[in-house]
A protein has these predicted regions:
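RNase H-like, Mg2+-dependent phosphodiesterase core
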Residues: 1-212
Length: 212
C-alpha cells in the first residue's frame, strides 16, 4: 500500500485537512477535509498516485478528484474575500478547515479519531484531537486527498469567475500575481474579488525594495 496510507494507518483513525488559495491576490480560500472509511483493492491503483497536489499535473488532479469524491466522506468549504478581509487570510484558512472537518465528523459520526492538519498551525477553537503535519500533503493520504479537493475546487471557481472578469486571466493564473495579472490591475483597477489587504502588502513591499 502507498506509504501515505501507511502513515495514516499508523495514526489510527484519521481525517485530513488542507487548504488552497492562501497566496493569491484574488478569490476566496478553499479548505477540504477527507476521511477514507476503507480502501478497497480496486481503488488502490488510482489512489497510489496520491501526493502533494502541487506536484501533480492538472489532468492527474482532475482524475483523482473524482475518485476521492466518490470514495471518501469529504467536505469542501469556500471562505470568500469579504471574510478574508475581516479576519485575515490565516484565520480564514483555519476557519475553512475547521468547518470542513466538523462537517466530515458529523457525516461519518466519528469517535476516537485524530485530525491531521497540513502545515504548522493547529485549528483554533476546535474541540477534537489534532496535530499539524508540516508538508503533510506529501506524507498523509487524507491530507493529500484534501489538498486535491481544495485545489481543483478552487481552480474551477477561479475559471468561473474569469468568465465575469476575463481581463485578469484567472482561468490561467488562479488569482496569483503574475506579470499579466499585475498589468491588468494597472489597466482595469481592482474587481470585487480582489483582496485589498494582500495587494496593499505587496505594493508596500515593492515600494520598500525600490528604496535600496
Amino acid at each position: 500500500m502507498n506509504e501515505l496510507f501507511e502513515f495514516d494507518k499508523s495514526n489510527g483513525i484519521v481525517i485530513g485537512t488542507d487548504e488552497a488559495g492562501r497566496g493569491p491576490a484574488a478569490g476566496g480560500v478553499f479548505a477540504a477535509c477527507v476521511y477514507f472509511p476503507e480502501i478497497r483493492e480496486n481503488l488502490i491503483k488510482d489512489l497510489l498516485k496520491l501526493n502533494d497536489s502541487k506536484k501533480l499535473s492538472a489532468k492527474a488532479r482532475k482524475s483523482l478528484y473524482d475518485v476521492i469524491l466518490n470514495n471518501s466522506i469529504n467536505a469542501i468549504i469556500d471562505i470568500e474575500v469579504e471574510e478574508i478581509e475581516k479576519i485575515n487570510i490565516l484565520n480564514a484558512s483555519l476557519k475553512g478547515m475547521k468547518l470542513a472537518c466538523e462537517e466530515v465528523i458529523k457525516k461519518a459520526q466519528l469517535e476516537n479519531f485524530i485530525t491531521l492538519v497540513d502545515g504548522n498551525k493547529l485549528i483554533r477553537n476546535y474541540t477534537y484531537p489534532q496535530k499539524f503535519i508540516i508538508k503533510g500533503d506529501g506524507k498523509s493520504a487524507s491530507i493529500a486527498a484534501a489538498s486535491i479537493l481544495a485545489k481543483v475546487s478552487r481552480d474551477r471557481y477561479m475559471t468561473k469567475l474569469s468568465e465575469e472578469y476575463p481581463q485578469y486571466g484567472w482561468n490561467k493564473n488562479a488569482g496569483y500575481l503574475t506579470a499579466e495579472h499585475l498589468k491588468a490591475i494597472d489597466t482595469y483597477g481592482l474587481s470585487k474579488y480582489h483582496r485589498p489587504s494582500f495587494l496593499r502588502k505587496h505594493f508596500e513591499k515593492q515600494k520598500q525594495l525600490t528604496l535600496f
